[in-house]
């Protein structure tokens, strides 16, 4: 990708061939569609949703990604972490899954390019994979560091009066009681 700073001049390496198209020099070989989805079609707010719609329009079968879980350990997630939905009007379902032996690091180039092409800032391999799956399946999700989850519990609840949080972009945001919070406290 081109990065998020578009405020100035892009400095290329000295060996950049003069006259070569920028997309060729950068190795950008992708098409990005900008779609306007009407409010009555939230099913089209994901890659799979758009694929289904195009498949129906062109009478083509959609190849869905596998949702099979590999590497079962026999250890049950619910034995290690509890999920509590404080009000089922907020969320009908929230599930947890523990994945062990993961190293947080910079995303590989292909993943960075994919998340940035859909307007999401690359953060690291874990957050980027989570965000990409969210956009692929239109399924909100979040990743937690298991070792940092307080009391082994995740709660789905309404925000508290005057509750604040610091988001991944290091901005402090004030919540309202209408906001849904996924919390370990």
Predicted regions and their residues:
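RNA/tRNA-interacting regions in translation and RNA-turnover enzymes
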Residues: 1-185
């Amino acid at each position: 990708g081109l990065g998020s700073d578009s405020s100035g001049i892009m400095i290329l390496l000295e060996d950049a061939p003069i006259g070569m198209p920028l997309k060729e020099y950068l190795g950008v070989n992708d098409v990005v569609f900008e779609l306007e989805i009407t409010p009555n079609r939230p099913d089209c707010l994901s890659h799979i949703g758009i694929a289904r719609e195009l498949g129906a329009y062109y009478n083509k079968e959609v190849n869905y990604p596998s949702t099979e879980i590999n590497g079962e350990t026999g250890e049950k997630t619910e034995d290690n972490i509890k999920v509590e939905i404080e009000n089922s009007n907020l969320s009908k379902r929230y599930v947890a899954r523990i994945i062990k032996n993961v190293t947080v690091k910079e995303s590989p180039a292909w993943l960075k390019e994919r998340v940035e092409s859909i307007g999401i800032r690359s953060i690291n391999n874990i957050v980027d994979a989570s965000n990409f799956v969210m956009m692929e399946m239109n399924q909100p999700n979040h990743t937690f560091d298991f070792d940092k989850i307080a009391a082994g519990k995740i709660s789905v609840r309404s925000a508290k009066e005057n509750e604040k949080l610091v988001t991944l972009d290091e901005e402090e945001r004030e919540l309202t009681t209408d906001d849904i919070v996924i919390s370990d406290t």
